[in-house]
Amino acid sequence: MSYTKFSKAVTKWLKANGLPCYGTAYDSPEETKARLDAWMRGSKEILRQWITDKRYRELISCAHGGWYQDSVIFEPLAEHFVAHHLFDELRFLCERGIRFSAEDMLATIKSEKEEHGTLDIETIRSIDVPSYVSGRSYSHLGEIAKYRKRALDQIIRYAGYLEQIHAPAEYLEQVNVLQESVSDLTIKTKDLRPFRFRL
C-alpha cells in the first residue's frame, strides 16, 4: 500500500516538473535512461519530503516491500534515523530483513537435514556465493550459504548503524551473539525472538 502511495507521489512530482514518467516498448535507450534518471530524481525528492513530514511508517513499509534497491530508500532512511537518534525506528526498519533472511536459512537447513540427515557446515562456508547465485544450479547447501551471507551482511550493516547511534550495550551484545550464531550456523528459531520489534 505504501509503495503505491510513494509511486503515485513520485509520478505526480514528475508530471508537475515536466519530467518523463511513462515509457513504452518503443522508447529508445536514451529515452528509457532519461525516464529512469527522472524517476530516481523524483524518488529522492519524495523520500526527502516524506522524511521531513515524518512519514516513517510508510517509508519503512516501502523499504520492507523490496520494490526499491536499498540505496534508494532503506539506507538514506537508516542514516536519517541514526543522525536523529531514532533507535526504535531503526530497529523496526532493520530487524525484519535480518529475521527473514535467518528464517529462510533455517527453513533450508531443516530441508537439508531432513533429506541428508546432517549438515556439511564446512562445505557451506566454502561456497562462493556470488558464483552460486549467478549460476543456474540449485542446491540446499548453496541456498543456505546465500541466506547466511545475506543475513550476515544485514547484521553487519545494522551493527554499524547501532554503534553510530550508541545503542544500549545489552542490545548490541544480542546482535553480536546473533551474528556469531548465523556465522557458525548454530542459530535456532528462538534466537530471533529479540528481533521482532514493531512501532
Regions found by a protein language model. Name each.
Residues 29, 40, 67-75, 101-104, ...:
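Generic helix N-cap/helix-start motif at coil->alpha-helix transitions
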Residues 197-199:
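Non-Sec secretion/translocation targeting segments of pathogen effectors
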Residues 19-26, 161-171:
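Charged, low-complexity interaction regions
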Residues 66, 97-98, 162, 182:
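Alpha-helical solenoid scaffolds that mediate protein-protein interactions
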